[in-house]
A protein has these predicted regions:
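N-terminal beta-alpha supersecondary unit
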Residues: 1-47
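Surface "functional belts" at beta-alpha junctions
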Residues: 1-16, 70-171, 189, 196, ...
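A general structural signal for well-ordered alpha-helical segments in protein cores
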Residues: 18-25, 60, 77, 174-178
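Short, hydrophobic alpha-helical segments
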Residues: 29, 138, 178-186
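Short glycine-aspartate micro-motif
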Residues: 38-44, 52, 95-99
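DPxDG-like acidic metal-binding loop motif
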Residues: 42-73
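Short, flexible loop segments at boundaries between secondary-structure elements
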Residues: 165-183
Length: 215
């Protein structure tokens, strides 16, 4: 059985505190039949909140070390793309656009086929740049995720289809993280790398301070 140790996000999409996350992990393990019933750990690698990704990956590595279970990871956008593929396949719909709110007025995005295969590697860009990139598509994609909800108006202006805000397709599901991670051949948790797509705020602030001192 593959157990998802982390998505790194709370119900509101924000990072969870590590102590709360550990309590949820223990609860999930108990629901599975305790740790003896768990065959591997899966972790969402991002993109997403810097804090959430760091907490999640470090927590998952700690659990892997303490339990001896293999640790695997999956891209959060790929998991959302997989959920969208299930929707478009059942409805005979278009390609899928996974969109997460990256804050700072930007989006994390990935485009997927009806089968959930990548057409783009994950990118970070502003809504207007995403709209321009979608301009070459022959059909309007179906979009989901926190970014699709937040920038619904901008995406709709480009013909992108966005389900209602309450539609569960907007949530990254643990089962999709698990399925993607389970397909990974490697179980070396030390080799997993977070997917940030841009420098953290602290790095930008240091660069800004350095530039000011150099002036």
């Amino acid at each position: 059985m593959l157990y998802e140790a982390l998505l790194g996000l709370g119900p509101d999409g924000g990072p969870r505190h590590s102590t709360a996350l550990l309590a949820e992990v223990e609860w999930a393990a108990a629901m599975a039949g305790d740790w003896e019933a768990v065959g591997a750990l899966a972790v969402g690698l991002g993109p997403g909140s810097f804090t959430g990704i760091r907490i999640g990956l470090s927590t998952a590595r700690g659990l892997a070390a303490s339990t001896g279970l293999p640790l695997r990871g999956a891209c959060t956008l790929d998991a959302l793309g997989r959920a969208l593929a299930e929707r478009t396949a059942s409805e005979g719909g278009p390609c899928s656009l996974a969109v997460l709110d990256a804050r700072r007025g930007e989006l994390f995005a990935g485009l997927y086929t009806r089968a959930g295969e990548r057409l783009w590697d994950p990118v970070v860009l502003r809504p207007e740049a995403l709209g321009e990139r979608l301009g070459g598509l022959g059909e309007a994609p179906l979009a989901a995720g926190s970014g699709a909800v937040r920038f619904r108006h901008e995406l709709a202006g480009r013909g992108v289809l966005v389900p209602d805000d309450a539609d569960p397709v907007h949530r990254v599901a643990a089962r999709h993280i698990c399925a993607l991670a389970d397909a990974e051949a490697s179980g070396d948790g030390d080799g997993l790398a977070p997917i940030y797509l841009r420098p953290p705020d602290a790095a930008r602030w240091r660069e800004r301070d350095t530039s000011k001192r150099a002036e």
